[in-house]
């Protein structure tokens, strides 16, 4: 027993709500190998790039060595085509940092840095408070071992939803900084 790392790359049809479904599925993963230890998401990387498919890089802690192939198979059975990349050095050392870039599909995108509490349900709270008409166009989270997680989120929010979006941010209660006008965002990510 101990903490092991599993990394998977999951793909699904690009439709609103699929990221939330993936997160719910991950939070409900069964135990493979008898361990009762809770899994934690250590990393999420995503950028909208295709109207038909989404590619999400997910890192998880596991309690049993060799669990990653079972996790990948489980996610695939639930309609998330998944590749176990636990032993793929190219993916783990380089590609994980290159997820993203400019996207012509990210219309009406607002970019925000959030401080998520490191506790179960924090991400699902965020997702459940979002309006179904808003779309996550970018998501980057990496566990740094603190009691909070720095998260960068791109949300497609129609201009007419400004008041509702402000209410969402207030109700959520997580500290945030809007970066939509940041010149680095405009240079590297905004289409």
What are these regions (language model features)?
Residues 1-8:
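Single conserved hydrophobic/aromatic residue that forms the stacking wall/gate
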Residues 11-18, 61-66, 114-122, 156-160:
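Short, surface-exposed ligand-recognition loops at beta-strand->loop->(often short) alpha-helix junctions
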Residues 19-41, 105-150, 154:
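C-terminal accessory/binding modules appended to enzymatic or scaffolding proteins
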Residues 22-26, 68-79, 126-130, 164-173:
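Short amphipathic alpha-helices in soluble, non-transmembrane regions
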Residues 24-28, 32-55, 63-71:
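Non-catalytic interaction/regulatory modules that flank or connect domains
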Residues 41-44, 77-93, 136-139, 172-187:
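Conserved short beta-strand edge segments in small beta-sheet-based binding/regulatory domains
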Residues 48-52, 85-99, 143-150, 179-191:
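Short proline/glycine- and acidic-rich turn/helix-capping motifs at secondary-structure junctions
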Residues 93-111, 118, 125-126, 156-160, ...:
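Short, low-order "capping/linker" segments at domain edges
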């Amino acid at each position: 027993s101990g903490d092991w790392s599993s990394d998977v790359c999951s793909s699904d049809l690009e439709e609103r709500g699929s990221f939330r479904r993936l997160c719910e599925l991950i939070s409900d993963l069964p135990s493979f190998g008898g361990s009762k230890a809770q899994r934690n998401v250590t990393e999420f990387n995503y950028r909208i790039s295709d109207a038909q498919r989404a590619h999400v890089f997910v890192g998880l802690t596991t309690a049993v060595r060799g669990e990653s192939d079972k996790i990948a198979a489980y996610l695939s059975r639930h309609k998330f085509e998944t590749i176990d990349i636990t032993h793929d050095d190219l993916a783990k050392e380089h590609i994980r940092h290159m997820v993203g870039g400019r996207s012509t599909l990210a219309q009406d995108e607002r970019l925000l840095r959030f401080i998520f509490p490191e506790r179960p349900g924090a991400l699902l709270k965020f997702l459940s408070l979002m309006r179904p008409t808003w779309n996550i166009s970018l998501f980057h989270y990496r566990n740094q071992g603190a009691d909070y997680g720095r998260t960068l989120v791109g949300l497609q929010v129609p201009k007419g939803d400004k008041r509702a979006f402000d209410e969402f941010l207030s109700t959520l209660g997580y500290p945030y900084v809007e970066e939509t006008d940041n010149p680095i965002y405009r240079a590297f990510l905004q289409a």
